Amino acid sequence: MSAPIVAVIGGGQLARMMQEEASALGIHLRALVEAADGSTGQVTPDAPVGAADDEAAVRAVVTGDGTDGPAGGPASVLTFEHEHQDSALLERLQAEGVSVQPTPQALTLARDKLAMRRMMSGAGLPQPAWAEIGGPQQESTEQMVDAIEAFAAEHGWPVVLKTPRGGYDGHGVLLVRSAESLRQREAAEWIASVARARAGQGDGRGAGGGGSLGGAAVTSLLVEQAIPFTRELAVLLARTPSGQVAVWPVAQTVQEDGMCAEVLAPAPGLDSAAVEEAELIGRTVAERAGVTGVLAVELFAVETFGEPTRLYVNELAMRPHNSGHWTQDGSVTSQFAQHLRAVLDLPLGATEATAHTTVMVN
């Protein structure tokens, strides 16, 4: 029996760590990488070079065209190390019978924060108050400013502006503290850039193209209530196409400049009711969205003495995640091995912690 072949789009550190686990599991990893000497290309024998939006390159990594020897032939499944994929291409492959995991439909919720918020609302999950800015009645800069001010009048300052797509590691997120700051500097440029895009005078990528708007074409913004959180948590789980779910202990994350700097697992001092709620939120998201592979749900926790802990969903990731790196040495099964198991619909590994506390520094 030949080894299963997992095709993965992306050549960064996450795909590299998938390769290490694939070798141990007897799985062949075929990675579409951005550079042959990049993080994944250095350690993966089968690593054709190409872009995630190059249809010919993506099809080749799925079919195995150009791959010789026992590793040739079509992949058992196509997966990813990042969410920034061509949805239309993935849907075409899916319609042709390719197993795409997570599915393009689920992946949309990780790529598009507005779609995610709508799904959360429909599922009744706890999240910050939010609104779309740049709708049909909000074409001009002043109309968008008025809409943000009206949102803040209801939910309070500060508010958080986000680009629906393209943001990562702190990019595409802006804290706005007052009505005055909304008309100054970066916030004003964000809003003006979106207004220009809606008027057909640009693509909304921000000042100078790209920049803090995250590098993606932006024709609307997401405004959210700023949650005065005590700490940030992450619930990490994996789900197979057949519906098996395995959840790791809830972890605490420490963010610096929008990036995960430290993780403590299990989250120290988190009460059992909050742990149960966090796990239920993760399971509900996975079931509601039909997630396959690893899912990370980032949460804000508001802890007040004598009151139940309140949790709010911040963002999602449908892939191995920085908050789960601790599982490599701190859990029976790492997130990278589990992701491979999950997308292949194999039995999931145990997720118990192997130490009282694991600390990961990113």
Question: Residue spans of the language-model regions?
Answer:
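Protein kinase-like catalytic core scaffold
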Residues: 246, 295, 310-315
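Short beta-strand micro-motifs enriched in acidic
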Residues: 238-240, 300-304
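Active-site "cap" helix and flanking loop/linker of ATP-utilizing ligase/carboxylase catalytic domains
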Residues: 276-297, 317-362
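ATP-binding N-terminal substructure of ATP-dependent carboxylate-amine bond-forming enzymes
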Residues: 1-118, 122, 134-146, 209-210
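Short, flexible active-site loops
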Residues: 258-268, 315-328
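Short, solvent-exposed loop/turn segments that connect beta-strands within catalytic domains
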Residues: 243-244, 304-310
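Active-site nucleotide/adenylate-binding loops and adjacent lid/helix of ATP-dependent enzymes
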Residues: 65-69, 107-234, 238-285
